[in-house]
Amino acid sequence: MRRSNKKSFDWYGTKQQFSIRKYHFGAASVLLGVSLVLGAGAQVVKADETVASSEPTIASSVAPASTEAVAEEAEKTNAENTSAVATTSTEVEKAKAVLEQVTSESPLLAGLGQKELAKTEDATLAKAIEDAQTKLAAAKAILADSEATVEQVEAQVAAVKVANEALGNELQKYTVDGLLTAALDTVAPDTTASTLKVGDGEGTLLDSTTTATPSMAEPNGAAIAPHTLRTQDGIKATSEPNWYTFESYDLYSYNKNMASSTYKGAEVDAYIRYSLDNDSSTTAVLAELVSRTTGDVLEKYTIEPGESVTFSHPTKVNANNSNITVTYDTSLASANTPGALKFSANDDVYSTIIVPAYQINTTRYVTESGKVLATYGLQTIAGQVVTPSSVRVFTGYDYVATTTKAVQGPYPKGTVYLAGTVQKDTVQYKVIREIVENDQAVLKFYYLDPTYKGEVDWRGTDTTGFIELLTTSPTTYKVGTIYDYNINSKITAPFTIDPTKNVMVFKESEQNEQGSKYRVIAQWSGDETTKGIYGKIYIATQVWTTKLGTNEWGWFDYSDDQAGIKFNNKGFWPAGVQNTLRNATPATAVETTYIYKESSKYGDVIVEYYDTDGKQIVNSVVDTPKSALGTEYNTDVDRRPASLVAADGTVYFYKEVKSDSAKTTGTVVAGTTTVKYVYEKAGSVNVNFVDINGKVIKAPVSDEKDAKPGYNYDTDLDQKLASITFEGKEYKLVPAGDYPVGKVGKGNNLIEVGNNTAKGIDPTTGKIEAGVNKEVTYVYRAVTGSVVVNYKDTEGNVIKDPETDVSDAPVGDAYTTTDKKPNEIITKDGSRYVLVPSKTDGEENGKVIEGTITVTYVYQKVANWIPEIPNVPETDRPKVPYPFDPTEPDEPIDPTTPGTNGEVPNIPYVPGYTPVDPKDNTPLKPIDPNDPGKGYVPPTPENPGVDTPIPYVPVKKVVTNHVDEEGNPIAPQEEGTKPNKSIPGYEFTGKTVTDEDGNTTHIYKKTPEVKNGTVVVNYVTEDGTVIKEPVTDTPTSPEGTPYDTTDNKPKTITFKGEEYELVRVDGTENGKVVEGETVVTYVYRKVETPAKKVVTNHVDEEGNPVAPQEEGTKPNKSIPGYEFTGKTVTDEDGNTTHIYKKTPAKKVVTNHVDEEGNPIAPQEDGTTPKRQISGYEYVRTVVDEEGNTTHIYRKLSNKPTTPEKETPAKPQAGKTASGKAQLPNTGEASSVAGALGTAMLVATLAFARKRRRNED
């Protein structure tokens, strides 16, 4: 089942109420303008339903096999249905038109500024004028450039607007009666933010030569119609105070959809209206849903840009109705609109209305030559009907005529942009809107060529692949009507007429694989509601296919389907769209211009100002405005100031009346009398201050600035400085002479240029010259000083030549002499001097002053000890420096203090001599009493500056003697002092004697005589063969020393692979050493080794035997209580050991039975002993192979007997049913079997030990 659709597209339905925004309009804003939105007023009806509507309708048949028509949702409008404005190939020209507009304002603003500068000095205003003129020059260059791009033009538009705004802001300071003295002649209304409320006006008199009656402060009839309403029944303006209704929407298509079978709702008898308030600085919109019947406001919201609100009243009318959402869409904002209001429900956009801008509607009063006399601006909302300010009387002018002109709409004339597209099955076309006048537009329809196979632009204005179908007549809003409809009947594309259906037939497609094709058709479909047949056009397609159920081919369209004629879908399907060709855009405002001509009964006097080159330097001023002929004037009194300041800031002084000037005094004549004055540029004198190299040491100063030519100046009197401090240094004027900077004259000023760092060589006195900026330069040199360092001893004697630390340094420079302060000085004669810091004279650190600073370092002469070493020439004798302490220069020298080398001074040791104190020949003390070779402690010098000789005296010869206790010499005497030593036959007693002469005697005693002996052990066989090397058991030892050779007595010895065993000992194994050698001989016999036997052992995991050892190699076997682990070990002798583990214990019981096996007592768990049972006597105990115990009893006879005394018997093996021997189980931890096992293990070990003993 296919659906049949009818949808509404209003190609003119988007209201456009913008205008150019002064200072804020350019080509860029054109590109950002908002196009109309498709789907405005979309509706859904049944396929066979005819809707009488002023809205456009799209009819589309898409049902291939069924006659049932199904209502469909209204078409959704999205970003793909809208398009930004696209410019044509003339976009550069359009942009230049905007640039011409904004540049036309620049001269007017600059002229006003010049007039103010002629009366007062204002540097800020002068700078703003200069900037505006600079930007104007650059803009004119772009206007003249035939190859300029849109981007370049737009950049100039922006630059000029910024400059003009800045200049306009400066001019606000200069007003007359609170009004600016000029207004701009612009083509478009001013949408610049204003403080005026909607309906308020403001007048400006531009021509200062005239007066206006009524005053420009009066509205003079200027007014607005506050609301912009359609002439539809029931639609009224808002009643909210200070709000103005600018548009409404009648909910027509929304209601048709809600009442359709799709929604099953109901129509809402209301309309929505939108209003702006009277504050032009705001953009909030009041949205009101209003009852058509009562006029009551059903629901309302104030919407800020970017917000959305929801109206819920429709659901109160019928629950199936959709809520209405109104979105203030700022994505559509531009310089001429804050955005658009989108009316939607369920994402279907039914209406899009652009919010108008606030704008100034200007009435102009101009002359026939185009000169603007005055303007009156009225604050409006774009689209409001304006009553202009009426004709006024201007002195000296006569009214001629009135003209009106529509204000530019949202886009400038020539703008082209995509209005919308239709892509329904085989119906494929686009609509492009072109602005042909400020208040007029046309629609151009292009259908897609059915044979075109290339790329298609559905989002822009590129018509490649399209064929132009028609262009509508220019449509606009006419006061008193609702819509303006198309009246153009011309079809652009080639077509033929199908007389059977009275439709125009256009191009057809190629056949597809099924033999089907389609062709484009159209039909004028307007009526009285569209003001004629050409107010609506039906654009559709027919398909070439077969009639359903037959092979009959033919052309079929949507109307056939609706008439019940069914046909096959062979790849193409027909569709159709009704297009209402109307303009729903109200006209933009109209501005009025009154034209005047000059009256011959009046005249005026203006004054112009020129420089000496004949160039006008400031704008003309009006001396006498339009006045009756014969009125007296005198410009010398009123309009000849002593000086003027040009727009570029140049100062001029009056010089004379220009040769072609009118008289400066007289009476007014018809027309304009022009008086011309000549002014000459002011002159200046600047003073510079540099050093001899040309470096600036003080900022230049102005001695005379913008002074009148001919005026005397004297910089020596006013600016010459004797000294200057710069960067902490003092500078003074230099005398006349040549310097790097150049030649300096007697006035201390530069008169010839040197190194080109300074070039001001004008004289220091003279006269101001017109247009000349004189430069005087004074030359300075830094004031200098020197620092000298002297070196003297404590007596004031010079010990070293003076040194210059700094020479000719600028005063104030830092200096330090510490780098020229040696701690020691050695003079040419070899004398040593040590610095005494406390006696330094002068400041070591400081700043240079003019003159010479002297710093004197004082040194102490430091002498030496001179050791007079015997046999050494006097010139070669060493010198031992005094350890002088410069921090304590007045303290005696301490000879034990380390010197400058860090060592304590000492007098050298000379063998055979002793150094003595020269004062009293007292021997000096050795530094180390035990080692005089380390030197001697020097004596304390009496004068640190005088050498102290150290004499050496010979010392007496000493000897060393070695004697026994009786004093007899036992070794030769030795010279010097020698230590004791080893002497054969003697030992040192520890006594040494030294006499007063230093002779040493060591005392010894005789060593006692000792007899020694040794003990040797031999190893031989019975026949005396040595089978082992002899061993010294006891080396040489004193007689009587105990010895024992058993530690050297092996039981066996292996010799040449055969084993020998000890059989006897010859000699004494234990005893005492005697003089000489004691011999002990061990005698051995060869061992005959029998063949080894192997055995098999059975042990548990701990190595304990669990069965008797067996000779030979036996396999593992079953052992009660144990199980084989699977492990068998064979040692190096071939013995085998099987390893077992204990079998887990099972639960056992104890039974008590008679000899027939009958129980005579209860069975007991575990192994329990026999017990006394009445009437029975114990016989024996049997333990089965499971470990269960059975005690057997014999029944007693009635005959009493005397019990026999039991005799303990050795345990015997009980008999079991199987006849196997069974060990009794006593229930104890160590059973008999365990004891037997232990005994067997002990026996085995004993046997093993005995075997090894035998082997030994």
Curated annotation (Swiss-Prot):
It is a peptidoglycan-anchor. Large repeats lie at residues 953-1006, 1089-1142, 1143-1195. The keyword Repeat applies. Gene3D superfamilies: Immunoglobulin FC, subunit C, Putative peptidoglycan bound protein (lpxtg motif). Small repeats lie at residues 663-681, 839-861, 1064-1084. Residues 873-949, 967-994, 1028-1049, 1102-1137, 1196-1229 are annotated as: Disordered. Residues 1-47 form the signal peptide. InterPro entries: LPXTG_anchor, MucBP_dom, SSSPR51_Rpt, YSIRK_signal_dom. Residues 1227-1256 form a propeptide. A motif (LPXTG sorting signal) lies at residues 1223-1227. This is Muramidase-released protein. It comes from Streptococcus suis. The lineage of its organism: Bacteria, Bacillati, Bacillota, Bacilli, Lactobacillales.
